[in-house]
């Protein structure tokens, strides 16, 4: 009975370590996509299902580190002075409001909460914010609203538009491949040690090394008797 209790205890510890790793470095491929344009404002609401157990809330940018914290909620609301290039407002309903967007606002924003009863970690909500420049929008609007009349200008603009879109598509695809590779690598790194450690613990609990050693000793003893 003690053997199984000890095994269950170790498995629980390993699962907690895995949960903490996923909380500290979450998978950004599942983030909610948000887009905005320079000079505009953008609102990031929290999760729709806030538990009554939740007591502490916070917003982060780029990573779940104290230096990247934007807002902190306990019994009162506090706006942290980190990230001076990001002008924002934090509201009591836990919404993050980004003001006067620029290219510096692009990135991952995390909304994190922690259960105070039982200290149960969960994956934070994240937004992948992309800010586009107004100049790019103006070019596309001009092409659509004012089509050229001459054949030469039409061919030139069509060629330019096709080249621009192709370059954007290739750049976007390359970025996706690189992001998926960067995301897959750290997750693979902790799975392999977890499997190895779990296997060793199971072998020790069921005394497989001791049984193997006893069989080896008995085999050597029988060999010595046969030789004599």
Curated annotation (Swiss-Prot):
Residues modified by glycosylation: 41, 93, 100, 128, 164
Predominant place of localization: host cell
Alphabetized UniProt keyword annotations: Glycoprotein, Host membrane, Membrane, Signal, Transmembrane, Transmembrane helix
Membrane topology of this protein: Single-pass membrane protein
Residues that span the membrane, as ranges: 189-209
Highest taxon in the source lineage: Viruses
Family: Belongs to the HHV-5 UL9 family.
Protein name (database record): Uncharacterized protein UL9
